[in-house]
A protein has these predicted regions:
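Helix-to-loop junction immediately C-terminal to a conserved catalytic motif
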Residues: 58
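ABC ATPase NBD coupling module
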Residues: 75-88, 112, 119, 233-236
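Conserved ABC ATPase signature
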Residues: 142-146, 150
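Catalytic Walker B motif of ABC-type/P-loop ATPase nucleotide-binding domains
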Residues: 167-170
Length: 273
């Protein structure tokens, strides 16, 4: 193991929501450590607070108790600008601003900084547009004219505009047909490797999970009940795990779990002094 500090460290996290006049505890003493270059997939049943964990890492939710540290800093204290340059987030509905062109959507966070000249901002946005496999001709299209896969790509480019070392993905293949989902997975895999990103992904799609993960973490009973390869996770005798991996959709998973997980992305920062 490396002595590098973790990219994400969640320590004894309590997430509590107020509903109908009472406190609902979503996470209780949840611990999770994510190291540089990992692509960790978080799985759990509905109501297990998977997206809440992503929002905690983004600083959009504040821990009721415990600590969420991202790149050495309390997530909740990063502020919007600090967060954008450190953490990119692809929300499930990858909503683009409908009144802006694709290129202007991608450039959005850079524009808000108001520190760069306009032509430079558009140049940077164009580089990101190409990086996610869109064509220069797509730059001036409006979101309404895009396929679902193109919307995801544009939203991904927007999340990566400030070169954050950490990328959060919420159900990245949801709503895509199988062909588009496969293509988007391939894109995520190559970006993870080429950019040396650390990625945290929430998904309930087994193909996406087994294709991309370097590690799988299972949230149940308000904390992480298992973490490791698919085979290691499936060896845990937990009802949710059995249902998830071996239920209806999981019939083929038992064949797939023999497949090893991907290694973490090679980190260029390892060569720095």
């Amino acid at each position: 193991g490396s002595m590098k500090p973790p990219v994400v460290e969640i320590d004894k996290l309590w997430s509590v929501f107020h509903e109908a006049g009472r406190d609902v505890v979503i996470h209780q003493d949840l611990d999770l450590r994510i190291d540089a270059g990992e692509l960790v997939s978080i799985v759990g049943g509905s109501g297990s607070g998977k997206t809440v964990l992503l929002r905690q890492m983004l600083g959009l939710e504040v821990p009721a108790r415990g600590k969420v540290t991202v790149l050495g800093e309390a997530a909740a204290s990063m502020g919007r600008e600090g967060a954008a340059s450190r953490v990119g987030m692809l929300f499930q509905h990858g909503a683009l601003y409908s009144a802006f062109s694709v290129l202007d959507n991608i450039a959005f966070a850079l524009r808000e900084l108001k520190t760069l000249p306009k032509d430079l901002i558009l140049d940077v946005a164009m580089v990101k547009l190409r990086m996610v496999g869109l064509n220069p001709a797509d730059a001036h299209k409006m979101p309404a004219d895009l396929s679902g896969g193109m919307v995801k790509r544009a939203a991904l480019a927007r999340a990566l505009i400030m070169d954050p070392p950490l990328l959060l993905l919420d159900e990245p293949t949801a709503g895509l047909d199988p062909g588009s989902a496969d293509e988007f997975c391939a894109l995520l895999q190559s970006l993870h490797e080429e950019l040396g990103l650390t990625v945290v992904m929430v998904t309930h799609d087994l193909d996406t999970l087994l294709e991309l993960s370097t590690r799988i973490a299972v949230v149940a009973d308000r904390h992480i009940v298992a973490s490791g390869s698919a085979a290691e996770v499936m060896a845990q005798p937990h009802p949710f795990i059995k249902e998830f991996f071996l239920g209806e959709r999981g019939r083929r998973a038992s064949a797939l779990i023999q497949a090893p997980l991907r290694p973490p992305a090679h980190l260029f920062s390892d060569t720095e002094t």
